């Protein structure tokens, strides 16, 4: 993997990588991973730059110490120069010119040292400002990358929510079909009850020559079976009415959840929980409808036995 001499080169490379588009797709996920790896390398470079800043500050402190030492040296030399001037005044036989040249040379060296320290301090300040600017650019690029990843996660969450809503609609359609079948079976049970009543009336009219006890016993059995069939039918219709109301509530809640999902992406978690609860209620309604349909079928299966009894009564 390529390394970077400066953070500025890394930031330029990162800007060139993300300037091609604002949104990521599945084909660019590998590129995002590479950019995250580059970001780690940039963080290492930033840490190195911070270390350089620390060293620069340390060098600055050392330069300031050298400057203080140079100032002390200048003061000491000035004092020595004063002393030597006094000595020159007191001792005119000494070589004044040589002493002055030595002191002047030392003063020149001190001035050069002070000038060099000032230049190094200026360079260090410029370097620190440049490093701060590069660090800000890296942090800005990192923030933009995080925003892109967050937008991608939000988009995926919305797609998942739409898929779950579609599944919920499919389940509602299945429930409606089951409900229609149950209503049809209940209607068949009602027709069977009417048919049983008619046959019972015919059997009663045709049984004038039978004994009264036999007629009463047969009629009681038919009425008992008819009452059971009517109770089962009423219970089935009542359950179906409740199922229809609950299905309408589920539809209304589903539409409300869809509106909430379109109005705000932040409500995805709430809608998900609501859809799960509604699906659970829909499953319960389906189970109850199946149980009612099963009981209706069992009652319908028991009808042939009563019909055979009526046939026997007619023959008698």
UniProtKB/Swiss-Prot annotation:
Tell me yes or no: is Cytoplasm among this UniProt entry's keywords. Answer: no
Its protein name is WEB family protein At3g13190
Organism lineage reads as:
Eukaryota, Viridiplantae, Streptophyta, Embryophyta, Tracheophyta
Q: Which UniProt keywords apply?
A: Coiled coil
Q: Which residue spans adopt a coiled-coil conformation according to this UniProt entry?
A: 42-90, 119-195, 233-266
Hey, which family's this protein in? Answer: Belongs to the WEB family.
Q: Where is this region: Disordered?
A: 295-316
- Top-rank lineage group of the source organism: Eukaryota
């Amino acid at each position: 993997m390529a390394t970077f001499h400066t953070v500025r080169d890394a930031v330029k490379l990162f800007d060139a990588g993300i300037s091609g588009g604002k949104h990521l797709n599945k084909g660019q996920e590998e590129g995002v991973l590479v950019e995250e790896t580059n970001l780690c390398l940039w963080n290492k470079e930033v840490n190195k730059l911070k270390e350089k800043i620390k060293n620069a500050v340390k060098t600055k402190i050392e330069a300031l110490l050298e400057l203080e030492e140079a100032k002390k040296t200048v003061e000491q030399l000035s004092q020595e120069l004063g002393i030597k001037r006094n000595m020159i005044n007191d001792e005119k036989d000494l070589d004044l010119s040589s002493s002055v040249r030595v002191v002047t040379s030392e003063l020149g060296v001190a001035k050069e040292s002070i000038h060099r320290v000032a230049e190094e301090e200026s360079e260090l300040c410029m370097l620190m400002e440049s490093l701060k600017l590069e660090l800000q650019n890296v942090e800005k690029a990192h923030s933009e990358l995080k925003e892109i990843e967050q937008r991608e996660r939000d988009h995926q969450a919305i797609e998942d929510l739409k898929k779950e809503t579609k599944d919920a609609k499919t389940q509602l359609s299945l429930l409606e079909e089951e409900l229609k079948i149950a209503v049809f079976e209940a209607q068949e049970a009602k027709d069977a009850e009417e048919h049983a009543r008619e046959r019972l009336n015919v059997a009663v009219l045709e049984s004038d020559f039978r004994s009264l006890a036999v007629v009463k016993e047969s009629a009681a059995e038919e009425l008992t079976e008819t009452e059971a069939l009517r109770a089962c039918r009423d219970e089935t219709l009542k359950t179906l009415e409740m199922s229809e109301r609950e299905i309408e509530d589920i539809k209304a809640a589903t539409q409300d959840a869809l509106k909430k999902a379109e109005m705000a992406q932040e409500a995805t978690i709430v809608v998900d929980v609501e859809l799960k609860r509604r699906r659970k209620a829909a499953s319960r309604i389906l189970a109850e409808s199946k149980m009612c349909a099963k009981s209706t079928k069992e009652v319908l299966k028991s009808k042939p036995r009563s019909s055979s009894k009526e046939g026997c009564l007619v023959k008698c």
